[in-house]
């Protein structure tokens, strides 16, 4: 059995290691603000990060620029670190922003499995030598076509590619096999080298970093217009490119102690009563804006996120339905419900029970609840206000309508 060290693709001498360490130390600020990989995502806040941060700081005074003007520092009282909760994390880009640029302790969550894994990589994981080496090994095995001759045929290939006459075209057969293969191999790498599975022993942070990198890389070769509610009838150029794994980010500085990630319904009693949220400085809420359920728009990513052994288990394998093969047990969010007071009741419960000093909520002029109603609900639990900015509408290919909408950032200072 080869040891992990013998499998490393990039070997450095002691002198080179010392030089690399010194270089990394001087480049921390640059690495912290490097642009990470991210999903093509409905409602991504990547383009709004500066506006959101500036508005939060104007309201709370919690975020100040570093003395050198290059990176920010976060402080709640005196020199203590700000605790920032991002409970509808989605792409994880907001969590990553406040972790890397402002040094916040981040507590993130999303009800979708794929999102919670990606967000964990952004909230807690670092890009270390083991992550780098395993990704390099997986890419080398793909280059050597280790996945062919049936080795890479798994759940994704059988159900979401045109394999053996299947009509679904979310991925090419070749890319689906590549995805299935690396998912299986990642589970093998996860175990300790002495356990007989040929693994290298990955920590939870390392495992989720690599899995998140697989998810982002799979999304980059998907054959969809924007989301996975449908697939294209012909493979576009992006989908034909061979699937390879690129690291989701290259941040090397450890997260603040106490940072963590959940995969939970935000309205569950267990989540709302979790002691980790007690005394949180800021809770940022970026809920669904309309009736589109994220579980139905990104379901293949949830499939890829699951351990392959679950997908072949009679008791755990998802039951698929319809032309697209959507799982029947998709999570249904009450924040997507129009009518019947369901959405309003969900927000009311959330604002009432969150143990936090400040709540900031992103919404827009086309969301389920109008601006006035949201201010009314928030006002039941403290002082509420809203800031606005013009923003371009999300579109997949073409949209014949207004190109700009009003983006809202609501603020609640809890009583």
Regions found by a protein language model. Give the residues of each.
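S-adenosyl-L-methionine
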Residues: 2-15, 29-64, 82-85
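Intrinsically disordered, low-complexity terminal tails and inter-domain linkers enriched
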Residues: 14-32, 62-80, 191-200
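Conserved proline-anchored active-site loop of SAM-dependent methyltransferases
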Residues: 52, 82-98, 108-113, 276-297, ...
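Class I S-adenosyl-L-methionine-dependent methyltransferase module
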Residues: 105-107, 111-251, 295-341, 345-346
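Conserved acidic residues
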Residues: 265
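Short conserved loop adjoining the S-adenosyl-L-methionine
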Residues: 268-277
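Conserved Class I SAM-dependent methyltransferase catalytic core
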Residues: 329-381
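Class I S-adenosyl-L-methionine
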Residues: 371-375, 382-415
